[in-house]
Amino acid sequence: VEANLYTTEGDIDLKPADRECFDIILAGFHKAALAKNPKDWWLFYVCPMWQDRFGYTKQAIQRNTDAYVKAIKSGHCDVITHLNYGMKTDVKQVAQAAKDYGVCLELNGKRVSMTDEEVMTIVDVGAPIIVNSDAHSKDRVGDVSVPMSVVERLGIDKNIIVNWEKLPRFGRRAAR
């Protein structure tokens, strides 16, 4: 299941009792999700609309980064989805936390929302990378052509993709 990162504290909108029902939990920022409270609504939804247009402050990037790092450290998710889509982060810091905690960073099947340099930062840090179709229709299930074109264009070794021709073992389940 894909949950929403919906607070600056790194909370996801999946109840603790429900987490055990899912084999894999993906988490990411989604523009249409509801925030947990008015402060997070302002910081997560209103501010990014302006920042996408006029630029992100260092403070905003760090706040967003901290939210992702807290989500990773919480142990409540296996994969961070479409990093930097709708909310700019410091990719190196997020990648380091992902590596340290065994959380995969997704290259998304609709769009890779990071620059080539940011994707290579993830590779250089050694964070686990997963490709995902992000299918919103049955015809797109398993279509990883978008992320794999980035992998091929950047010369990334396919063997570092945790779900390339093999089933990954996710950190949250491995810890059980």
Which residues make up each language-model segment?
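Short acidic/histidine-rich active-site segments
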Residues: A127-G142
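Active-site catalytic microenvironments in core metabolic enzymes, especially phosphate/sugar-handling
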Residues: E2-N4, V123, V146-M148
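His/Asp/Glu-enriched short active-site or ligand-binding loop at hydrolase and phosphoryl-transfer sites
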Residues: G102-R111
